[in-house]
Amino acid sequence: MGIFDWKHWIVILVVVVLVFGTKKLKNLGTDVGESIKGFRKAMNDDEKPADPVVNPVPPAQPVHPQATQPITERRTFDVQAEKVEEPTRKDS
């Protein structure tokens, strides 16, 4: 038999109907049905063959970046730092 007998399922069904009401259960059933229908449609769309992919035309000559010399000298920037004012509250 198992844990739940048919009598247990009837009691559970009655409690669910009393808690949620028939209108909410009907709406829930409709929403679940529409979700399943959308899922099946998406699965069928995936099974259809896709449009043929157009291969892009390769460039005439491959682009090779020119080699550059590494930077050997040190560079510094002369800047002057400015002090930032502390923020003040305007509502006090």
Swiss-Prot record:
Regions that span the bilayer: 1-21
The alphabetized UniProt keywords are: Cell inner membrane, Cell membrane, Membrane, Protein transport, Translocation, Transmembrane, Transmembrane helix, Transport
This protein's GO cellular component annotations are: TAT protein transport complex
Protein transport is among the record's keywords = yes
Top-level taxon of origin: Bacteria
Q: What is its main location?
A: membrane
Membrane topology label: Single-pass membrane protein
Q: What InterPro entries does the record tag this protein with? A: TatA/B/E, TatA/E
**HAMAP family in alphabetical order:** TatA_E
What's the family? Belongs to the TatA/E family.
Q: Which NCBIfam families match?
A: PRK00442.1 (NF001681), tatAE (TIGR01411)
Query: What's the protein here called?
Result: Sec-independent protein translocase protein TatA
